[in-house]
Amino acid sequence: MGSFSIWHWLIVLVIVMLVFGTKKLRNIGQDLGGAVKGFKDGMKDGEGKAAADPAQSKELRDSTTIDVEAKEKTRQQ
């Protein structure tokens, strides 16, 4: 009674197929598979970009630094 047998799961599957229909279930499966694939691709891209970012940020920091002499401003009354 604690676990379901294969027959219980088959009955549940048949009921779900009757309620949603096979086309709707297929679309849900495709959407879920596409989301998982997109997530995995995003994780791979994120790891590759994270490794390249420190070197690129140092170059940007060096190229945008402006080196000038500071002038003392006096107050006139």
UniProtKB/Swiss-Prot annotation:
Keyword RNA-binding in record:
no
Transmembrane spans: 1-21
Q: Which GO terms describe its cellular component?
A: TAT protein transport complex
Q: Where do the segments described as Disordered lie? A: 46-77
Main localization, broad class: membrane
Single Gene Ontology BP annotation: protein transport by the Tat complex
**A GO MF label:** protein transmembrane transporter activity
Its placement in the membrane is given as: Single-pass membrane protein
A Pfam family cross-referenced in the UniProt record is: TatA_B_E
Which keywords describe this protein according to UniProt?
Cell inner membrane, Cell membrane, Membrane, Protein transport, Translocation, Transmembrane, Transmembrane helix, Transport
Q: Which HAMAP family match?
A: TatA_E
| Record family assignment | Belongs to the TatA/E family.
Assembly notes: The Tat system comprises two distinct complexes: a TatABC complex, containing multiple copies of TatA, TatB and TatC subunits, and a separate TatA complex, containing only TatA subunits. Substrates initially bind to the TatABC complex, which probably triggers association of the separate TatA complex to form the active translocon.
The record, for PANTHER family, names: SEC-INDEPENDENT PROTEIN TRANSLOCASE PROTEIN TATA
**Function noted in UniProt:** Part of the twin-arginine translocation (Tat) system that transports large folded proteins containing a characteristic twin-arginine motif in their signal peptide across membranes. TatA could form the protein-conducting channel of the Tat system.
Name used for this protein in its record = Sec-independent protein translocase protein TatA
Organism (species): Cupriavidus necator (strain ATCC 17699 / DSM 428 / KCTC 22496 / NCIMB 10442 / H16 / Stanier 337) (Ralstonia eutropha)
